[in-house]
Amino acid sequence: MSTYAASAKQYAERVVSHEILTCEWVQKACKRQLDDLIRFKRKSSLYQFNPELLDRYGRSYRPADNLCAFIERLPHVKGPLASKMIVLEPWQVFILSTVFGWVKSDGKRRFRRSYIEVPRGNAKSTLSSAVGLYMLAADREGGAEVYSLATTRDQARIVFGDAQTMARLSPGFRNRFAVNVGAHNMHVLQTGSKFEALSAEGSTLDGLNIHFGCIDELHAHKTRTVYDVVETGTGKRDNSLLWVITTAGSNRSGICYEVRSFVTKLLNRVFEDDSQFGIIYGLDEGDDWTAKDSLIKANPNWGISVREEILVPLQAKAMQLPSAVNNFKTKHLNEWVSADTAWMDMRSWDASA
């Protein structure tokens, strides 16, 4: 087994054995992967995990390894790690290897939709931007249409902007794949592929022929318009991917919670859908949100991009300021709250009366 695939399997095993502190949804996502490795271990199985494939020039590659190695040749673009090469953490390798490693007999990906829910600060945009560049230039798709989509222009440009900066800081990437970086899009003339940011504000979203559609922060979408457009647009290709990565929110009647509910039922084995990947980082029911272990449990990038010296004081502030609790729980513990209104700890109120 390759280094990346082995790392992904080891992460899953450590999660399932409770060596790594995670919530039930991460445990179930890892258990699903481990079960699938057994279920589809025969070469005649419906799916193969990270097999050796041949490109159009007869060169061999393994899909999970190819993606992970590609991403680790790209730079960070923000914060203290800016300009340093990305080093994927085990949880990221697990997600990437699982989504991209499973293929059908024709080499096309098993997973057509991916839902990743994780608290703020866990390098969501960095991961999505890097995957977007891969899908633009290295996924062996002619005329690939890659989009970062959102309800607003500013939100849509976050992932695209990070990818744009990555490309500008990576002359090796631009030269290897002949990528042209413009102000509003990136394109590869040789393959007719492009990467753009699109929003529901002033953009015509109908009729898109999407190879990779990235929806960042789906919880902020008040309607299902963008999601439905991407789901329809990716249906026009046979190796496309709808990639959703988001934090929790408050709208339990919206499209994000609908997709989340679908994923939780899938992870609970209520039904099977071999085209959907899902993983949700957060807390379990009954966990004490004021405990430090809860911060570690909910944030897979703890100690890397999520720093104790920043998050612990925010937790302490929320413990003393009821109006800050909802925001803290949602953004930093990935907990869906019932409303945007301030949360009131009635026990604290009574105790201080």
Predicted regions and their residues:
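Phosphate/NTP-binding elements of NTP-utilizing enzymes
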Residues: 1-353
